[in-house]
């Protein structure tokens, strides 16, 4: 089960929260994971996941991550998903144990051997209460039982030394078929049939008041049905964090003006990115709903990741940021844009409408929603269906990119 817990922590947890939330989690886990306080930025999601497996072998730190998500208002849905995934893993293990107990066949695989040890726990406990002689005759099985009991005790979440979580009793396990790719039954009923909604997206029906920081001009993209549609990107912030937003209803463009306060509901969240479509609600915030966004949140929202950190990322991770174009090489099917900063350089592959855009060396490229990919071990950023590029010419303001 250790691998399953690690999978949940990494793929359904750390990879699904935004950069600010991940930095907050690392800050709270400094003591538990012995992180360098002055150099927390260097730790990537998979490094943190590996460290959590070593520190919390019983559940790979899943309980700590769930408690963290429960304490962040915008991550409560993520906490529910992780709980259901954990229940599903436990339920599948229990069903497998029951099947093994009902079957006369002798387990031969490693998994079956582990399940047999679980059965030994029950049978040995019963025999220990009957006679001492049977206990002596089952010394080998008792050894397995002790190991299982030790593991069972470790499954209970310990008291946190820091503010990451609080002591809590184990959550009752219930049967659930939910996964990160299937929203909860409650959300499924209200989820519209919209192809823009990614698999595993979480519906947030409760209202959230945010301040608009930036918004791009609308641009065309090709939908999964091969239809040409329009959308735009935006960045919004609350009092505690910022979000990148994909807006698939361009009629809302006027509401997404800088420093405007809006209240959104019935929106989706996927991997820390908010998605607003035709069924979402976006209203002007009432005066009493106005919020004050700290300057540090605004700075973090406008900051670009270091290229060395991008290179350490997990394949599929989405990146946003402004980078200097170092080299441009036009090919038949795509264009290679080499971007560079003080920490290194990386190739950006543009195809479709991002093939041979109007830019030259020294220009600034503002990348929106580019995905990290590895080919032959080399990391590169590639465009996707919702990618967008803005070009800043030397001494000029940002402008939407155009094909030469």
From Swiss-Prot:
Domain Pyrin residues, every copy:
1-88
Q: Where is the composition biased (Low complexity)?
A: 102-112, 122-132, 168-185
Q: Where is the composition biased (Polar residues)?
A: 186-197
Q: Which GO annotations describe the biological process of this protein?
A: activation of innate immune response; cellular response to interferon-beta; response to bacterium
| Coiled-coil boundaries | none
Q: Where is this region: Disordered?
A: 85-198
Extent of Basic and acidic residues compositional bias: 137-147
Cellular component GO terms, alphabetical: nucleus
User: Where do the HIN-200 domain residues begin and end?
Assistant: 192-392
Among the GO molecular function terms of this UniProt record, one is:
double-stranded DNA binding
Location in or out of the cell = Nucleus
Query: Which of UniProt's keywords are assigned here?
Result: Nucleus, Transcription, Transcription regulation
Q: Which SMART domains match?
A: PYRIN (SM01289)
Q: Describe the function of this protein.
A: May act as a transcriptional regulator in the myeloid lineage. Inhibits cell growth via p53/TP53 and RB1-dependent and independent pathways.
So what family is this one in?
A: Belongs to the HIN-200 family.
Name of the protein in its database record:
Interferon-activable protein 205-A
Organism of derivation = Mus musculus (Mouse)
């Amino acid at each position: 089960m250790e691998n399953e817990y690690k999978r949940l922590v990494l793929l359904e947890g750390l990879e699904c929260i935004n950069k600010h939330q991940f930095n907050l989690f690392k800050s709270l886990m400094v003591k538990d994971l012995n992180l360098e306080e002055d150099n927390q930025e260097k730790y990537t999601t998979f490094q943190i996941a590996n460290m959590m497996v070593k520190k919390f072998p019983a559940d790979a730190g899943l309980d700590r991550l769930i408690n963290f998500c429960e304490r962040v208002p915008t991550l409560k849905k993520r906490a529910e998903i992780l709980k259901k995934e954990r229940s599903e893993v436990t339920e599948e293990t229990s069903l497998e144990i029951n099947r093994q107990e009902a079957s006369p066949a002798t387990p031969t695989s490693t998994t079956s051997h582990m399940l047999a040890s679980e059965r030994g726990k029950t049978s040995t406990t019963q025999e220990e209460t009957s006679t001492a002689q049977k206990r002596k005759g089952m010394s080998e099985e008792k050894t397995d039982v002790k190991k299982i009991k030790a593991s069972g005790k470790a499954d209970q979440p310990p008291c946190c030394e820091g503010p990451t979580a609080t002591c809590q009793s184990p959550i009752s396990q219930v049967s659930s078929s939910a996964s990160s790719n299937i929203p909860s039954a409650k959300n499924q009923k209200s989820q519209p049939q919209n192809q823009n909604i990614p698999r595993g997206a979480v519906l947030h029906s409760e209202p959230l008041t945010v301040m608009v920081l930036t918004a791009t001009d609308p641009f065309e993209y090709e939908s999964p049905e091969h239809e040409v549609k329009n959308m735009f990107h935006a960045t919004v912030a609350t009092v505690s964090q910022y979000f990148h937003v994909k807006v698939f209803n361009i009629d809302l463009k006027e509401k997404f003006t800088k420093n405007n306060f809006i209240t959104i509901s019935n929106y989706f969240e996927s991997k820390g990115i908010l998605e607003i479509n035709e069924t979402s609600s976006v209203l002007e915030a009432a005066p009493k709903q106005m919020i004050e966004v700290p300057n540090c949140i605004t700075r973090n929202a406008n900051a670009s990741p270091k290229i060395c950190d991008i290179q350490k990322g997990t394949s599929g991770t989405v990146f946003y940021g402004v980078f200097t174009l170092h080299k441009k090489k036009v090919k038949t099917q795509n264009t290679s844009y080499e971007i560079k900063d003080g920490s290194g350089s990386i190739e950006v592959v543009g195809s479709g409408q991002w093939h041979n855009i109007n830019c030259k060396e020294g220009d600034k490229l503002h990348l929106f929603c580019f995905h990290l990919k590895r080919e032959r071990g080399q990391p590169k950023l590639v465009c996707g269906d919702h990618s967008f590029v803005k070009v800043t010419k030397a001494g000029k303001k940002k402008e939407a990119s155009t094909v030469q």
